[in-house]
Amino acid sequence: MSEEPLPGPRCWFAANLGWLRDPAGYHARQRQRFGDPLGGWLGRLRLALTGSPAGVRQVFAAPLDTYAPVGVDLAGMLGAEALPVLEGAAHLALRRRVNAVLLEGEAAQAGPAILAIARAEIAAWPRGRAMPAGPLLQRLSFAVIMRVVFGVIAPGRAEAYRAAFARLARHAGIGLVLLPALRRDLGPWSPWRRFLEARATVHRLIAEDLAAARASSDAARFDTLARLAALREADGAPSLSDAAIRDTLVVLLSAGHESTAAAMAWALLHCWATPGVLPRLRAELDGCDGAAASLLRLPFLEACAREALRIAPVAPMMVRQLARPMTLAGHDLPAGMLVGASAELAHADPAVFPEPEKFRPERFLDARFRAHEFFPFGGGRRLCPGARLALEEIRLVLAVLARTPGLALADHRPPRRVFSGPLLAPSRGGPRILLQEQAT
């Protein structure tokens, strides 16, 4: 076993800058040069990054006491009781409760609501002019996650949330994660002050609705907020603190709509731009009655959604921090070092996905990929609780898009993949589309 530092770039600043400039290609080039696992950096913390099936499996399957809370100040951004911040027993306990709520509440019955929202939103899109699809899909996806979290909500209240989260997204750049110096309040125009003010607005809105849910006696409510607020211990005390519910909802509302909207934008681009895919998808849809349950059983529709998540993973890596030493692929890693499973590298492995640069949905019809080969929503104990809902939403929205008359790409040039907060999204607002005027 090697006791030498992992091969990789030595300068933390240059490594972070290279990743920021080219998040989709930087680590692939570094791995080609240095091998797997790759030594790298996240901020000023050393990182061991792997995309090999064996390495990813080891990262995901490590015992519970292997990891500690990540030294990057995620708590300062997401909240001290957010799922991505917690480790060990606290993480497992919150995860079980959130999973139970998402599997039994509004999220478990969201299919018809997603279809209704998608049809209404897409019917209102402007016609006769080219426009970026990204903002339109973000609005649609935010409407879906609002329905899941809050149920039916007054339009004015929904718009207040939309504006608050849009402001939060503008000020929660990846630079705040990578560069600790930016997380200082230097006055009204400093990045950290603007982030804190945007987050305070979001927290205030959630606190108001949480207080109303705590005081409500409506047992018929099945929205996520109401069900989290209603959880009780054996002695009748609330299972979750207000802070835990608030931090959980911030993650669900922000990551839940931004990541799904980005995935839908890539699915739209590739399905419309890849010869043969859209006709095959429409033929499959023509044989379906259009109900949500029926659409969710269509194999090629699901394959298109999964291939979009493979070719352009929205979350480029899943990172943990070692609480104790680990040996990864023959390299001894010390406690305190970060280890990451890279979806970016794993999803482009030609040994697992032949011709990985090509959009080929049929690969998901011909084979079943294991959890350490295809993991767009994370893996192991860190699998995203909203994974099932997100995949359903991508499929149902893609079905509505494919059935929308006159929808075409206005520009076949693919956008670049760039950071939007900690996630990767299409540049320039995503693919440009054109909805032709309807004949009268």
Each language-model region and where it sits:
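Cytochrome P450 heme-thiolate monooxygenase catalytic core
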Residues: M1-P5, Y67-A75, A90, E106-A262
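Cytochrome P450 proximal C-terminal region
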Residues: R31, A118, A166-R167, D286-C288, ...
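Conserved cytochrome P450 K-helix E-x-x-R motif and the immediately C-terminal K′/meander segment
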Residues: A14-G35, A291-A329, P350
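Conserved cytochrome P450 K-helix/beta-meander segment immediately N-terminal to the heme-binding cysteine loop
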Residues: L64-D65, A341-R368
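Cytochrome P450 catalytic-core helices
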Residues: S259-E284, R388-P405
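N-terminal membrane-proximal hinge/A-helix region immediately C-terminal to the signal-anchor transmembrane segment
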Residues: M1-A93, A108, A113-A120, P155-G156, ...
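Cytochrome P450 I-helix active-site segment
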Residues: P5-R10, G111, L115, R167, ...
